[in-house]
Structures are given as C-alpha cells and as structure tokens.
Regions:
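Extended recognition/assembly regions associated with phosphoester-bond processing machinery
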Residues: 1-261
Length: 261
C-alpha cells in the first residue's frame, strides 16, 4: 500500500510506500522542459535557462533533504527539444541530475520530449523504459504510452505529460496549474481486471511552462486520457489547486480538457 500527499504550494508529490518490508519516501515531479525555447517563443519571454535550472536544482534538493526522501522519480520531459540533444541539454541536464543523485536515488522515466536523453544522463541515474516502472502498487509513467496488461496488478497510476491547467474566463485561476485526481473503472485500462484504479495527473514542475487558451489540452494527447475521460468510466474526481484548495469535481473537467465528457 502507499500514501500520496501533495507538497504544499509545489507541483510535487511525496509518496510513502512499503518496498521490501521497508517504508520508503519518494519525491515525484514531472515535465521540467529544460531549455524550453518553444514555450518562451510562444509567450514572448526571454528566459535564462541556466538560472532557471539552478533554481529548480536548489528547490528539489531542499525538498529532498527536508523531507528525508529515499528516492526521486522524474516522470519525463526533462528536456524540451523533442528530436535531438541541443547545447543547453549538454550543459544543464547532467549537472542537475548529478546534483540530485548526490542526495538520493534518482529514477528517470523518459517522456515524449526525451529522445536520446541517455546521452546526457549520468551513469548513476536509473534510466527506465518509456512504459514506466512499478513501485509497490503504483505505476509511474510519463503518460504518452499505454500501460501493458502485465501491469494490471497495480492500483494507482502517477503520470505527467498533459500539464493540467484550469481554464475559465474572468476567473483568477484562469491559466493556473492544477492537480487532477481520478478514480476510474480499472477495466478501462486493464480489460481483464475488476474494481477501481486511482490516477494522479501532475502539473509541470517548471513554473515557466503554463497553459493559456491556445494550448488547451486534448484528450488524444494521452492514450490513457482517451480511455478514461467518459462519464461511465469516471467514479470520482477532484480538481485541486497548487495550494491544495479543492476547486471541484468531474463537472469541472470541461474547464481542463478541450472537450466535455
């Protein structure tokens, strides 16, 4: 069994999970998008990625140390350039990963932006497959691939990829990052299984990567979303702000995804 908690005012999770008869604490983040020239160009902002990456490194190190975590799980899209490793990646990513690995074990699950990420990943980082990994009863995955039926023994999916964002005109929360917590019918993902499956969708950790009306999420961005965003599949839903305020239930999903249920 596992216990999942959000980090107050941060798009990060702390998970207590029993592994090999020992309680382990895991810090989970997603979607750093280091060197995000695409995002900066579309928002007309000049960004200093050396400063931003140092800021992320400092924040994650402080969280890992203060919470005495045993490991950090990075849920993908560490870099932003989809097709290649660019100069900023060579300069920034190894330093970030090396710094975190000096504190605890680090697991990196590649996302759709992480092609050739192995070229800039230090040897002491646990580089996993794109399908993710299982710890205890949880599947950790980026969210751009569909889970294998072989993973059907899990009870929870923790994923990134979609950058969940709240959209409502004239709302103070319009364009703000949010958490999405779902309980769905398990057979929507694992047809041979009965019961329920919990799914947690992480916001992007990078505070400069955010949503606007031009980037509204489509359910087809993730094969997992495509299967579960239906009224007859969703059993329970909580939409939660970064500070932990509950904003609503499944009735607000239309404010997050570019379609109604």
């Amino acid at each position: 069994m596992s216990q999942i908690n959000i980090v107050e005012n941060k798009p990060a999770l702390l998970i207590d999970i029993r592994l090999d008869n020992k309680l382990s604490k895991i810090l989970v983040i997603s979607d750093l998008h280091v060197g995000s020239t695409y995002w900066s160009q579309n928002n007309d902002i000049a960004l200093d990625w050396y400063h931003i990456t140092s800021e992320i490194e400092s924040e994650l190190s402080d969280m890992a140390i203060s919470n005495k975590v045993d490991s950090i799980v990075l849920l993908g899209d560490i870099k932003n350039n989809i097709f290649k490793v660019v100069k900023d990646d060579w300069n920034l990513i190894p330093k970030l990963l090396h710094s975190l690995s000096a504190i605890c074990q680090v697991y990196l699950i590649p996302g759709n932006h992480d092609s050739k990420i192995g070229l800039v990943t230090p040897e002491n980082i646990h580089l996993m497959g794109v399908k993710g990994m299982v710890l205890g009863d949880i599947l950790f995955t980026h969210g751009h691939t569909f889970p294998s039926e072989l993973r059907s023994n899990i009870n929870k999916i923790i994923m990134g990829h979609i950058h969940p964002t709240f959209f409502r005109e004239n709302s103070v929360l319009n364009g703000q990052k949010i958490w999405v917590f779902l309980k769905v019918k398990k057979d929507a993902i694992f047809p041979s299984s009965k019961g329920s499956l919990e799914i947690v969708m992480l916001p992007s950790y990078n505070k400069y990567v955010y949503g606007n009306h031009r980037m509204k999420i489509k359910r087809t961005n993730s094969p997992i979303l495509k299967k579960i965003l239906r009224k007859d599949i969703i059993e329970k839903c909580l939409i939660v702000s970064i500070d932990g305020t509950i904003l609503g239930n499944e009735n607000l999903l239309g404010e997050v995804f570019n379609s109604s249920l």
